[in-house]
Amino acid sequence: MSSDGMNRDVSNSKPNVRFAAPQRLSVAHPAISSPLHMPMSKSSRKPLVRTKIRLDPGHSALDWHSLTSNPANYYTKFVSLQLIQDLLDDPVFQKDNFKFSPSQLKNQLLVQKIPLYKIMPPLRINRKIVKKHCKGEDELWCVINGKVYDISSYLKFHPGGTDILIKHRNSDDLITYFNKYHQWVNYEKLLQVCFIGVVCE
C-alpha cells in the first residue's frame, strides 16, 4: 500500500472514545453543630444599647481636649499643690516611695512644679490612699489597669455621665468596665493630666 493510501485511511478513521456522563456533585450541608453555623449569642442578637447622656454646655470631648492641652490649667483644674503637699506628708506615701529623696521630690513637685505624669519612675500610690480619695462627685480617684487617676475634673466630661463612674468607684480596677464601653479609646492620653501614679498594696 502506498503512503498516500495510508494517510487517507488514518484521516478517515474516527477514534472510538466514549466520555462518561457528567456526575452531579453532592454537597454535604454542615450540621447545625458545625462552626459554620454557630448559634447566635445574645450579644450578637441584641447589641449593647447605651443611654445617651446630655452633657452640660462646655463639656464636650473637644472642650476636654482644649482644657487639657493648656499647661497653665494643670495646677488649677487637675492636680492642686495642696494635694501634692498632702501626699508628701502622708506616712504611707513616704514609706511606699522611700526610693525617692524627700527633699528632691518636694523640689520637683512644689518648686519646679513638674507634673505628676512626668515623674519617672511614677510615684507609688497605696490603695489605702486611693480609697481615701474616693468620696464621690466632689473627689474621685480610680485605678485603670494598675494606674491611679484623679478623675474628679473629668466626671462632667464623661460621655456616659457621672453616675456610672461613681457607682464603680470602689472597684479594684476599672479596666474591665473601660474596655466594655471604650475599648478603642486611649485612656492614657485622655486622662494624662489626671495621672497620679501606679497603685501598690
Curated annotation (Swiss-Prot):
Q: Does the keyword Metal-binding apply?
A: yes
Q: Tell me what gene encodes this.
A: IRC21
- In which organism is this protein found? Saccharomyces cerevisiae (strain ATCC 204508 / S288c) (Baker's yeast)
Reported consequences of knocking out the gene = Displays increased levels of spontaneous RAD52 foci in proliferating diploid cells.
Family according to the record: Belongs to the cytochrome b5 family.
Per UniProt, heme binds at: 158, 182
This protein's GO cellular component annotations are: cytoplasm
Q: What is noted besides the main data?
A: Present with 450 molecules/cell in log phase SD medium.
Task: Quote the SMART domains the UniProt record gives.
Answer: Cyt-b5
Keywords recorded for this protein, A-Z:
Heme, Iron, Metal-binding
Q: What is this protein called?
A: Increased recombination centers protein 21
Which PROSITE patterns does the protein's record reference?
A: CYTOCHROME_B5_1, CYTOCHROME_B5_2
